[in-house]
Amino acid sequence: MLPRSLKLIKKVGESNGLRNFGSQSNSYTLPDLPYDYGALSPVISPEIMTLHHKKHHQTYVNNLNIALDKLSSASSAKDVAQMIALQSAIKFNGGGHVNHSIFWTNLAPKNQDGGVAPSGPLADAINKQYGSIEKLIEKMSAETTAIQGSGWGWLGYDKANDRLVIQTQQNQDPLSVSGYVPLLGIDVWEHAYYLDYKNVRADYVKNIWQIVNWKNVAERYNTAKK
């Protein structure tokens, strides 16, 4: 039986193309970026993108594989105490893998429609619930910037109540642990912005909207609504 933390990560992982969650193989790999490391400059520098993707995300993948290998051994040995002890590592590193895999696709270079406002059902939902895209951005920016320590700001979909939600998560906790479908995430761990923005997180959050891939967010929304 899968621990609760792995079940939650498996669910959101499968919804984002990470099909080997819960398979017999525990070998997860770093996804390719859909653009070059320098494509998001000057909002995010090539140096940050390279470190963030090749070092930080890769570390989450490596540590997730290690934790799942240990879980497999503990399960075979029927070592329930060890299985329970591994849940925090699986949640943290699995969450880091899932969160970043979404994050990369949530962004796009300006010459590939990065920052272009959404249209269609997502735009209608935003206007109905928040009044305008500008008001959504203002609210989500304020809540994301105010996160204490490390974490993520999310725009999600609440299937039970058919509504959008703005939710912050600490550390690498995936949005799925709050019961929502992730649509758009903003990483506010310092490794995501410090080399470019130093300690001025607000400037990073303000500028990242210039490269949000609203087409990707809209596709996630349409899929979640089905």
From Swiss-Prot:
One of its GO terms (cellular component) is mitochondrion. Keywords: Manganese, Metal-binding, Mitochondrion, Oxidoreductase, Transit peptide. Its cofactor is Mn(2+). Residues 1-28 form a transit peptide. It comes from the Eukaryota. One of its GO terms (biological process) is superoxide metabolic process. GO terms for molecular function: manganese ion binding; superoxide dismutase activity. Its EC number is 1.15.1.1. Mn(2+) binds at residues 52, 100, 187, 191. It is found in: Mitochondrion matrix. Belongs to the iron/manganese superoxide dismutase family. This is Superoxide dismutase [Mn], mitochondrial. The lineage of its organism: Eukaryota, Amoebozoa, Evosea, Eumycetozoa, Dictyostelia. The gene is sod2.
